[in-house]
Amino acid sequence: MPYLTTVSPAGGASIANLSFVSVVPPRFAASHAAVRRHLRNGIDGSVISEPLFVGYRTTSLSPTSTPDRASFYTYERFLATLLFLAIILACGLMPMQPDTLWQLRAGRDMWQSQHVLLTDVYSHTAYGSFWPNHEWLAEVIYYAMYRFGGLPMVTLFATALIAGGWAITWRLAKGPVRAVFAWTALALVPASLWWEPRPHAFSLLFVMTTVFLLVRRRYLWLPLVFVVWANCHGGVLLGFVILAAGLGVRTLMAPRVWWQAALIGLGCVLAATATPLGLSFWTEIPKSLMRIHSYPIDEWRRPNVMDVHELLFWVIAIAFCGTLFRKRRTLSGAAAGDLTLYACALAVLPTAILAVRNVGPFLMIAVPAMTSLVLVRRERAARRETQRPLLNLAVMSSAAIAVTMTIVWAYRNEIPHLHWAPVPASALVALGQCPDNLYNRYDEGGYLVWFAPDRKVFLDGRQDPYPPDLMRDHIRMETVGGDYKAAFSRYGIHCAYLPAVSPTVAQLSTSGWKTLYHDSQWVVLRD
C-alpha cells in the first residue's frame, strides 16, 4: 500500500511556504529521497541538478522511476474530470440563440464576399446604415465551423472556448483539490447562464488568458491576445479593465520600471485599433454600450439576489470581499501573482454587479483568488490516504461515455431544446405568401435573418444600426401594447411574424389582419 508523505519546508520564502505532497510507494523510496534533496536545494538557493515536476495538487515521481499506470487516475484527476465533463455537457446542450444565427449569416456573407460587413443589409428599417461590426472575426470563425460540421460543430467549438477558459481557472487555483473543486462547482452555477455559442465565448477564454499572462508575467503576449480579442468581441473593453488592474499591481511593486507597464498597455491599446473600425473603435464600442444599457436587454440587467442561481454569485462575491478585508494586513507579504489575482477580481466585480453577463468572467477570476486567500495548509505529520485508482478510472470512464452518448443522441435527434430549427417550415411557407415589409420582434429577428434570407427584417439582435426611437417604440409595442399603426405606416409594413403571446397579435387580429399561420408558438399575419 502506498504511504502519503508530507514534506513541508521550514520557512522557505522561495517556495511560498507551500506543502508539497507525493504519494510514494516503498519501491520509490529512492525517488522520494530526491524529492527531499530537491526541496532542500530550493530552500538553500543552490542550483537544482535533479529534474522534478512537483506541485501542490499533483503526484510527483522521479523521471527515472517507472510508476504504476494506475497511479495516474488519482482523486485529483477524478474530480477535475467530473467537473469538466459537467462543463462540456452544459455547453454542448446550450440552446442556439437568435444572435448566433444572424452572426452565422454575417459570417457566411463575409466568407463569400471576402470583405468585412460594416453596413446593414438585413433590415428594411436601417438598410444601408453604418454597422460597427466589432465581432466580424468571430462571425467568420463560427461560419467556418458551420461549414465543417453544421450547428453541432458551432456548439462544440464554443464549448472548447469556454472549457479552455475554465481550464485556466483550474490551473491558477491553489490548495487542496477538494477546496478548489468546491469553489469551482459553486461558481459554475451562476456562470453557466451565458454559455451559448456566440462571440461572448471568445471573451470568456481571453479574460482568463489575460489574467494568466499577467499572473505569470508573460507580458509580451498580451498585445497579440488583444488584437485577436478586439476583432472577435466587444468584451475586449473588459480586458482593459483587467489589464489596468494587473499592470497597476506590477507598477506598485516595482515603481522604477513603470515605463515597462506603460509600454505594454500602449501596445494593447494600439492592438485594439487594428480592426476594421480603426480609431473609431474607441468611440463606437462605448456608444454601443450606452445604448444597450438604455434598453431592457436580459443579459445587461443586474444580477438578481432573489434568483437561486444568481444568489451564488452574491455569496462568492461577499465571501471574496470579506476574506480580502479580513486579511488586508497580511497582503503585503503575498506573492505578486496572488496580488494580481485579487486586483483583477476586484476590478471586474463592479461590472458583474452592473450586468449579469459579466458574472461569469468575475467568477472565473474569483475562484483562484479565493483558493489563494483561504489556502489550507497541510499538516506536517504523515497521514494515510486511500487512493482508489481503478474505481476512479471506472467512474471517469462511465461519466465520459455518458456525456458523449448524451450529446451524440441530442445532436442526432436534434432535440427541441437545442433550438436548431426554431422556425417551423410551414411558417416559412406562410412568410412566402406575405408581402413586404415584415414586422417581427427584436428577439426573433436573428432566426429570420438565417432561415428566411430573402426577407428583410424589422429588427434583430444587432441594436447598433437601429435608431433609438425605433427601439423604444418597439419596446412599448411589445410590453404595454402600444399603438402599432404609426410604425407600420412609417415603414410600410404589411406582414407580421410574431410569437403567439405578443400583444401586437391581438391588436392586428382585432384590426382585421388575416392569419396565414398559427400554432402554439408562432403566428404569421398579413393585412
Model-predicted regions and their roles:
Residues 87, 187-191, 208-213, 220-234, ...:
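Membrane-interface alpha helices of multi-pass inner-membrane proteins
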Residues 111, 237-333, 363:
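Transmembrane catalytic cores of multi-pass membrane glycosyltransferases
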Residues 125-152:
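Short hydrophobic/aromatic helix or loop-helix immediately within or flanking a transmembrane segment
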Residues 156-174:
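Transmembrane-helix motifs of polytopic, lipid-linked glycan transferases
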Residues 207-220, 322-330:
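Membrane-interface transmembrane helices that cradle and orient dolichyl/undecaprenyl
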Residues 471-523:
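Periplasmic/luminal catalytic loop of GT-C fold multi-pass membrane glycosyltransferases
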